[in-house]
Amino acid sequence: MSVEHSPVDPSAEPPEKAEEAALRPGALAEFGGQQRVADQLGLVLAASKSRGTTPDHVLLSGPPGLGKTTLAMIIASEMSAPIRISSGPAIQHAGDLAAILSSLVPGEVFFLDEIHRMSKPAEEMLYLAMEDFRVDVVVGKGPGATAIPIEIPPFTLVGATTRAGLLPGPLRDRFGFTAQLDYYEVADLERIVTRSAGVIGVELAEGAAHTIASRSRGTPRIANRLLRRVRDWADVHHESPVTPQGAETALDLYEVDPLGLDRLDRAVLHAVCLKFGGGPVGLSTLAISVGEEPQTVEEVAEPFLVRLGFLMRTPRGRVPTDRAWRHLGLEPPPDSSGEGLF
């Protein structure tokens, strides 16, 4: 079983990135959901504009698909500034970072995705650049090596991470504004789906946006992906406007159930409940039983199942809750470890 093209995988596939860009809002006022973060960030940007200064460095953390890249682009747009985009894995040497920083123009926004994956030497160079707008380039080797300071123009670093706990304290402390993005409410996702439908030219009947939003796992990227799959179905079946029943039929075809569970999620639940009699079962054994890599099970399926209250991670292994048994149409056994917890 492969989830590489699962419609509810929160990571973006390369072909999707151009489609995502077309659906991104260009201003904070258009950014759906995350109202607290949008209000706080709006205040930071407005104050910077009134003072004529560059905004503080910004750290955005949270699961994939919640809008970190979109917010970075909005920051640049709101400040009428250019944006430079890179990622932690692409910066493995201090020289790579020095080349980028030394070519920034005043006020430019530097978006560094997956900042937690940057190399240690580059990370240490970034400390000085963020604080003093300077980088020290070492020339020569051994005892004769000399550090040459290079001034860089004021810039705003926007760092994005899905694993904020991996960032060292000295790096986190240099961000003037930090925000944790949360999963979206269905009502917010409905507004996002409605807006995106207008952008890509899909007419939705009343209730269709809710059908899509409720299966989107609280994630805008997934909501927009499901909308595109519904559009495909509607084009082939000549349905316009798309009704809630039509959207439901399309998403059933892609094996996304009303809670947003896909084939892998259900396979994990079946394995834990039926193959292993309610567990506990270890990750490696569970992965083998569903035909997936342990990392895929741990990073794609389990977080959502835990968030729904269907699965517990215990020191002895994975255990289903009573809700998981009932979702499969089964009564939990009398000695169920998840009895009464959810």
Curated annotation (Swiss-Prot):
GO terms (BP aspect): DNA recombination; DNA repair
Assigned EC number: 3.6.4.-
Residues that bind Mg(2+): T69
SMART domains on file: AAA
Molecular function GO labels: ATP binding; ATP hydrolysis activity; four-way junction DNA binding; four-way junction helicase activity
Compartments reported by the entry: Cytoplasm
GO CC field: cytoplasm; Holliday junction resolvase complex
Region (Disordered): 1-21
Cystine pairs: none
CDD domains named among the record's database cross-references: AAA
Leading EC class: hydrolase
Residues the record lists as binding DNA: R313, R318
Top-rank taxon: Bacteria
Family per similarity comment: Belongs to the RuvB family.
Protein name: Holliday junction branch migration complex subunit RuvB
